[in-house]
Amino acid sequence: MNRENVNKDTPLYPGMQPDLKVEVAIIGAGTSGLYTAFRLVTDNKYKGNEVQIFDMSDRLGGRLESVVMPGMNFWGELGGMRYLTSQEIVTTLIEGYPLKEQDLNKRTPVLKDKMTPIPFHMGEPEKLLMYIRKERFKQNAWTEEQKHDNKLITRYYLNEEDEGFSSDQLFNKIIYNVLMADSWVAETYKELIIADPNGYDYTFKLTSRDWDAIKPRLIYNFPGSPYDKRLVNDIGFWNLIKDQVSQEGYEFLANAGGYYSNTINWNSAEAFPYMVGDFSADTTYKTIEEGYDSIAYAVANAYMEHEGARIWSENKLITFTKDHHLPHTHKYELTLLNIQSNTTWKVYANSLVLGMPRKSLELLDQNNFFFDASKQEKLNENIRSIIMEPAFKILMGFERPWWRDLDIHSGHSITDLPMRQCYYFGTDDETKNSMLLGSYGDMETETFWKALSDDKVLFKVKAAKSASLEALHKLDDVQATQFMVNELMNQLRELHGDSVDIPEPYVTYFRDWTDDPYGAGYHAWKAGFSVKEVMPYMRKPLADEQIHIIGEAYSDQQGWVEGAFCEAEKMLQTHFKLDWPYWLDREYYLGW
């Protein structure tokens, strides 16, 4: 395992410097905040000491966190874990430019840290499991039946015309039918929205630009429906799915799709491109061999190379005001709490960039001039235009890759049990120690796991090959509860069946992203909000203030690092007048 390529010992400064004066104060050392600092100083807009980052955590990266478990020589992911090669900012920063050059060795790197892009293996559907309503299938069972002109009948009472469709196919069928029922869409994009003659498959060749043209004006044309003639943007996704394929069809999609978060009652117009994904030519999922949080460290290191650059860790923003004694030189006075000393101190800045999701914004002083609900009604409404989606992750270390007994090597299995899915992450070639991710990032299961994760008795680590108790005990405070491990093992055994003997884990690693200050693992737009208007609004909510809100939460790629990068880039170009990055393809579409 290479720990040399990416420097993850980026210096963090947990101290304080009362009355510090800066041009730009960035709150949040997640990907959007780090990217903003990197661009402002490398573009020579400001010097390093004029742009400072503050974060209440003792680490950087926000909701990216890669860890190595004792006895294993590879990284596991507690947060975001992959990117799509169609996401050009993140791909270029990781792989170099130009992206049109297929040979990665011939590309020019943007950042000094050398990240190694590797495929994010989705596994083989003919081996991976789907366990729903107490029936066990291989994930390709639907398409296998279709090859023989049969329909796979499950224990879901689907409408007759929907029987035999896999969950992916049924999602696509719904989206196809709604798009084609709008005569303008059907006429304008008929070459790009294709139904396969086999009756099950649909192909969408729509670009992000196409979707942005479609989303605000797509009409739901289904006479007799409660939602007939309404904008799809104003219909909840659950409402729409039930209307198209019945409540039982909805249950099938919610369970077999693997994520309840995809089928919550969020904005249908935003859900469509999210569900279809970017299937433009050669788009693949990748990750970084050095851990996916390497992208955060590499961007941070590029900023930190500049003299005076600093990331103030363990410093929490409490409030900010314009009413202070230095209004002639600095617009805002920030009050920060230094966590180690438990004392407050002041920072003065002319621009404020809040690289924060909804919950973090709500934890700031809601009575200051910016958030004051009686005066800033529109801002408060728009802050609440997104749904916070809970996400728990639990990594488990086993002394052998027991899933190989089922001929499974990578990918994930899906179930309607509260665990929802598990990813088979990797195996150390020497020790055979192996990692599994139990990921229940979901709305409906949150209370099930919360009752278990709140218990006081934590899992006790056990020594394993090349994993000393001393090394393992360092992870004592991040163990899942014994309750949770017991329940998860019970569900893993039910999901995989009697044909495999599943041993107990020797170590776990638990992260609940619902905890403050994140409040959620990712976010989703509510139905009825004009996303086209809210996105640019959030990047500068008040016309006469230099205060900007960025991050994945209010982006059109929620849950992706690219969403955070695109919002930061648009904010920088519009409000800081930065030029288009020299390393980014000029044709790349950044969205609204």
Name the predicted role of every residue range.
Residues 1-24, 42-48, 591-592:
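Extreme N-terminal leader/targeting segments of oxidoreductases
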Residues 313-447:
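Mid-domain catalytic core of redox enzymes
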Residues 41-70:
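Glycine-rich FAD pyrophosphate-binding loop
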Residues 190, 194-319, 323-331, 335, ...:
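Active-site/ligand-binding neighborhood in enzyme catalytic cores
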Residues 72-118:
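Conserved FAD-binding subdomain of flavin-dependent enzymes
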Residues 106-262:
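Mobile amphipathic helical/loop "lid" adjacent to a hydrophobic cofactor/ligand pocket
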Residues 28-32:
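Glycine-rich Rossmann-fold phosphate-binding loop(s) that bind the pyrophosphate
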Residues 2-11, 406-592:
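Conserved flavin/dinucleotide-binding core of flavoenzymes
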